[in-house]
Amino acid sequence: EADRMMEALDWIIWEMTDEETRSACGAGYKAFYRHDTGYPSNDFFKALDPRMEHFIEEKMDAPIKSIGETAGYLCESMARQLGLLAGTPVGTGIIDAHSSLPGCGIGEPGEMMIIVGTSSCHMVLSETEAGIPGVGGLVKDGIMPGYFGYEAGQCCVGDHFAWFVDNCVPESYAQEAREKGISVHQLLTDRLKDYKAGQSGLLALDWFNGVRSPLMDFNLNGMIMGMNL
């Protein structure tokens, strides 16, 4: 039985400060937290499983900190490990993809950033809140303080490519990549760079992990059409 449930980013901050807090980013995008109403009600969790009725107060309840806010101060034990001064301010944690916006200088509305990795995250800041079908993430102060952070995208991108390379590429391609000293991914990219859209005759629907935007249905499946021998 778990004593506490939290995102890794909150655990790291807890270890550094010896104070348990929760990031508005992690709580909002991953645990349904809203700035005005908090977490879902006990009835919501009870409907999932009667044993979860008091899940929030028993496993997750802690002060919520906005991005850019001081979460606490470096504790003595961690200061010794890191060679830093105890009492050094420690910022609130942020999810990896979401940190890309301030890291790339996007600090106000009007610009969208697409972060592509295992999944793809399409993120944009706004001064206003609006429920938009197909946009699964909307958190106040979740990316930059003072703004609503919108998140859409797809839940299967890099892992889709990895699956294809591991399961659908002939050994001759793998051998060629080894001889050239490049990855199979790079070999496929080189072979396809002069192809026009649709030239191969293949059609692919990239819902192999379901679809995030715009349908928000993780029970849907992907497919590849047009293959022959």
Pin down the residues of each PLM region.
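Active-site core segments that coordinate phosphate-bearing ligands/cofactors
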Residues: E1-R22, K30-F55, G68-L229
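Dinucleotide-binding Rossmann-like beta1-alpha1 core, especially the glycine-rich loop
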Residues: G26
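Long, well-ordered, tryptophan-enriched scaffold segments
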Residues: E58-K59
